[in-house]
Swiss-Prot record:
Belongs to the paired homeobox family. Bicoid subfamily. PROSITE patterns: HOMEOBOX_1, HOMEOBOX_2. Residues 117-144 have a biased composition (Low complexity). Probably plays a role in the development of the brain and the sense organs. Can bind to the BCD target sequence (BTS): 5'-TCTAATCCC-3'. This is Homeobox protein OTX1. Residues 94-104 have a biased composition (Polar residues). Residues 91-144, 257-306 are annotated as: Disordered. It is found in: Nucleus. It comes from Mus musculus.
C-alpha cells in the first residue's frame, strides 16, 4: 500500500482506513486502478464507454482476455474493470431473465455453465427437472424391466426392493432403484448418472454416485441403505465420511467384506454394494457415483468416470446435496436422480458414455 501512496502523511490513512480518501486525495497517483485497497471507488462509466461495452456484450457474453484488453484500451479503463463489468452485466441479464424476462436466452447459457461447473443451487434448480424426467424414464424402464428388475433386484441386491421402498420416498424412486440395481434399469439410471461423471458436474455425479452407492449398498443391505440413503443426502459431500457417518459404514464393512476388498474407498463400498456382483473397477471412488451407474453400467466400466467422480464427489456432493436435497432426497435415494440431475447435462454425455 505504502508504495502506492506517494505521500507518507496519508500512508496510514490509505492503508488502514480510507482507500477512497486516498483516491480523492491523490487522483493522479493512479492509485485507484492497481493497488489493493480496502474499498475501491465505484467505477462510473461514461455513455460512450458503456456503448462500447454493450456492443461487445451483444457480440459475446464471455469475451476472452484479448477482446477485453482491446476494449479496455478503447475506453481507457483497466482490463480488470472491463472484466468486472461483463461479470455484472451477465448477472444483470440473468436476473432479468429470472424475473420473467424470457426474451434473453443468453443468461440461460450462463446459468447452465455454472451448473456444470459447480453451482449447486443453480444446478439443482435447473437440473432437478431433468432428474425427475430421468427418474421417470428410469422408472418407465424400470417398470418395463420391472419384473426383471424386481426379480433381479431381489436376487442380486437382496434387500434392494425393500431398500428402495424404504429409502425412496416415491414410487419412481423405487422403480428407479430396481433399475439402478439392475442392469435393465441401469440403462436409464446410467443415463442420468453418466454425464455427471463426465463433467465437472461430475462432482454432483459423484455425489449421486455416493448416494447411488449408498442406495446400492442399501439395496444390498436394505436396512443400512435406508439410512444410508438419507444420510447420503445429508452428507453428500464427504462421500466417504458420509458413508462412514451413515450406516454406510455398516454397509461399508459388509460391502467390503462382501464385495471385493479391493474396493478402494468407502464409496467403493457403496458401489460395491451396488455391484458387488460386478467388477471391482466399478468400485473406484467413483464407484460411488458409479455406484449405481456401475450397476447399470457394470458392463460399461465406470471406472473411468469413477475416478473423476470421486474427486468431485466430495466437493460437489455437498452443493448438490443441499439444493437438490429436498427434491433429490428421494431422487438421490432413487438414483441420485437429483444428483444426476445436476449432471443432467452431463447426463446426456454420460448416457453415451455409459451406453
Amino acid at each position: 500500500m505504502m508504495s502506492y501512496l506517494k505521500q507518507p502523511p496519508y500512508g496510514m490513512n490509505g492503508l488502514g482506513l480510507a482507500g477512497p480518501a486516498m483516491d480523492l486525495l491523490h487522483p493522479s497517483v493512479g492509485y485507484p486502478a492497481t493497488p489493493r485497497k480496502q474499498r475501491r471507488e465505484r467505477t462510473t462509466f461514461t455513455r460512450s464507454q458503456l456503448d462500447v461495452l454493450e456492443a461487445l456484450f451483444a457480440k459475446t457474453r464471455y469475451p476472452d482476455i484479448f477482446m477485453r484488453e482491446e476494449v479496455a484500451l478503447k475506453i481507457n479503463l483497466p482490463e480488470s474493470r472491463v472484466q468486472v463489468w461483463f461479470k455484472n452485466r451477465r448477472a444483470k441479464c440473468r436476473q432479468q431473465q429470472q424475473s420473467g424476462n424470457g426474451t434473453k436466452t443468453r443468461p440461460v447459457k450462463k446459468k447452465s455453465s455454472p451448473v456444470r461447473e459447480s453451482s449447486g443451487s443453480e444446478s439443482s434448480g435447473q437440473f432437478t427437472p431433468p432428474a425427475v424426467s430421468s427418474s421417470a424414464s428410469s422408472s418407465s424402464s424400470a417398470s418395463s424391466a420391472s419384473a426383471n428388475p424386481a426379480a433381479a433386484a431381489a436376487a442380486g441386491l437382496g434387500g434392494n426392493p425393500v431398500a428402495a421402498a424404504s429409502s425412496l420416498s416415491t414410487p419412481t424412486a423405487s422403480s428407479i432403484w430396481s433399475p439402478a440395481s439392475i442392469s435393465p434399469g441401469s440403462a436409464p439410471t446410467s443415463v442420468s448418472v453418466p454425464e455427471p461423471l463426465a463433467a465437472p458436474s461430475n462432482a454432483s455425479c459423484m455425489q449421486r454416485s455416493v448416494a447411488a452407492g449408498a442406495a446400492t449398498a442399501a439395496a444390498s443391505y436394505p436396512m443400512s441403505y435406508g439410512q444410508g440413503g438419507s444420510y447420503g443426502q445429508g452428507y453428500p459431500a464427504p462421500s466417504s465420511s458420509y458413508f462412514g457417518g451413515v450406516d454406510c459404514s455398516s454397509y461399508l464393512a459388509p460391502m467390503h467384506s462382501h464385495h471385493h476388498p479391493h474396493q478402494l474407498s468407502p464409496m467403493a463400498p457403496s458401489s460395491m454394494a451396488g455391484h458387488h456382483h460386478h467388477h471391482p473397477h466399478a468400485h473406484h471412488p467413483l464407484s460411488q457415483s458409479s455406484g449405481h451407474h456401475h450397476h447399470h453400467h457394470h458392463h460399461h466400466h465406470h471406472q473411468g468416470y469413477g475416478g473423476s467422480g470421486l474427486a468431485f464427489n466430495s466437493a460437489d456432493c455437498l452443493d448438490y446435496k443441499e439444493p437438490a436435497a429436498a427434491a433429490a432426497s428421494s431422487a438421490w435415494k432413487l438414483n441420485f436422480n437429483s444428483p444426476d440431475c445436476l449432471d443432467y447435462k452431463d447426463q446426456a454425455s454420460w448416457r453415451f458414455q455409459v451406453l
